């Protein structure tokens, strides 16, 4: 974990403790989960994205989850076992079905660390029946959050929350537009840090930070001279230095098409109802939960060509249930047919060394030069 990330976590601990003193309920959410934070915010709660990895948290997680479980899930459980000052303030854990890792991790956290769990289930298809199911599921989720919060969520409170989150999405979209038009002023690591602000400090702090960053871009220009790459696949939580290693090798990550990327927020919630929320989250194109949608690979190659990138780096956390070998094979075939330079990286927190990744990145750089 970098010095900046360490300081962010320290500051987040202080904020969460202050919120607890104000009788705010803290809801832990697996960082990659498709959980409508709007409902938690509307209920007066604070959604905290569980996004910490690194240290010996993954190995500690083996006490609860098999070593063949993805190391992000194991790291999350390991943080609880290590009595993380941030995570020990959590009042409820949102238990979703984003992936097998989330299912297992949230079950262990609730059972062994005695934290209330609130269930939410998402479909994996984009059909009319899936939308109907999700609308009903979000209504159940809303009722469960209301019961835990001790009061109902009014229509006005939900509308206010949706508009606030849409404001953040508009700011992110504006930033992406400036990045594209001006030649990518911010590095991939800097863009990643913007999302970490949201994960740790919440929607209001994220909005203020984005406004400051946008103002700071005025009059700035890109440094240039680096090979531009598209980053896709698994997200990069706090403590994962993969994008830092990529950029240290002379690349510039111009698009991060994961749940830790700005392009994840390319659309808005159109309306102020549960139905509007369901449509938004079901159609999240860059969500790993929807990785098997037919448009994913077509969309990836289209973005590559439109951005004039030099290559694609596809990142997979080892044992991730969302990226089986069939995905790797299909992706490799698609990119080979298009003659697109491509590197697939697989990593396990606590096991894969930086030196191993640096060697592969250097070879890829030589290929695209």
Regions found by a protein language model. Give the residues of each.
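Gly/Ser/Thr-rich loops at beta-strand to alpha-helix junctions
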Residues: 29-37, 96-102, 232-239, 318-326, ...
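Peripheral docking tails and interdomain loops at the edges
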Residues: 328-369
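Glycine-rich, highly charged phosphate/nucleotide-binding loops
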Residues: 66-84, 289-302
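A charged, amphipathic alpha-helical module
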Residues: 2-27, 139, 143-268, 282, ...
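Metallocofactor- and cofactor-centric catalytic cores in central/energy metabolism, strongly enriched
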Residues: 10-20, 28-30, 36-38, 57-62, ...
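Redox- and metal-dependent alpha/beta enzyme cores, enriched for Fe-S-associated oxidoreductases
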Residues: 33-34, 38-53, 60, 232-303
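C-terminal hydrophobic structural anchor segments
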Residues: 293-338
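Acidic/His-rich segments in extracytoplasmic proteins that coordinate ligands and/or metal ions
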Residues: 75-147
């Amino acid at each position: 974990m970098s010095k900046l990330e360490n300081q962010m976590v320290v500051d987040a601990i202080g904020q969460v403790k202050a919120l607890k003193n104000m009788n705010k309920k803290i809801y832990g959410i697996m960082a990659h989960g498709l959980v409508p934070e709007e409902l938690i915010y509307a209920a007066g709660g604070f959604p905290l994205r569980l996004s910490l990895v690194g240290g010996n948290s993954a190995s500690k997680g083996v006490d609860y989850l098999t070593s063949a479980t993805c190391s992000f899930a194991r790291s999350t459980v390991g943080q609880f076992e290590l009595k993380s000052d941030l995570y020990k303030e959590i009042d409820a854990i949102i238990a979703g079905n984003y992936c097998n890792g989330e299912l297992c991790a949230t079950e262990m956290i609730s059972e062994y660390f005695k934290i209330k769990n609130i269930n939410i289930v998402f479909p994996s298809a984009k059909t009319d029946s899936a939308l109907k199911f999700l609308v009903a599921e979000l209504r159940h989720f809303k009722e469960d959050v209301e019961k835990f919060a001790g009061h109902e969520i009014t229509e006005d409170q939900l509308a206010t929350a949706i508009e606030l989150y849409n404001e953040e999405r508009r700011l992110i979209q504006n930033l992406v537009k400036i990045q594209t038009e001006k030649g990518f002023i911010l590095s991939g690591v800097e863009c990643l840090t913007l999302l970490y602000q949201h994960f740790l400090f919440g929607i209001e702090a994220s909005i203020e930070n984005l406004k400051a960053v946008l103002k700071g871009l005025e009059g700035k220009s890109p440094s240039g001279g680096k090979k531009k790459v598209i980053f896709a696949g698994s997200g990069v939580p706090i403590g994962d230095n993969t994008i830092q290693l990529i950029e240290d090798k002379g690349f510039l990550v111009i698009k991060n098409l994961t749940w830790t990327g700005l392009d994840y927020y390319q659309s808005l919630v159109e309306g102020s109802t549960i139905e509007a929320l369901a449509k938004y989250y079901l159609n999240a194109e860059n969500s790993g939960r929807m990785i098997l949608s037919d448009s994913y690979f077509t969309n990836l190659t289209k973005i590559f060509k439109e951005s004039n990138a030099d290559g694609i780096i596809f990142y997979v956390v080892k044992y991730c249930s969302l990226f089986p070998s069939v995905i790797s094979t299909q992706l490799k075939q698609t990119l080979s047919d298009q003659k697109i330079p491509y590197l697939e990286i697989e990593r396990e927190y606590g096991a894969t060394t930086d030196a191993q990744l640096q060697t592969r990145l250097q070879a890829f750089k030589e290929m695209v030069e």
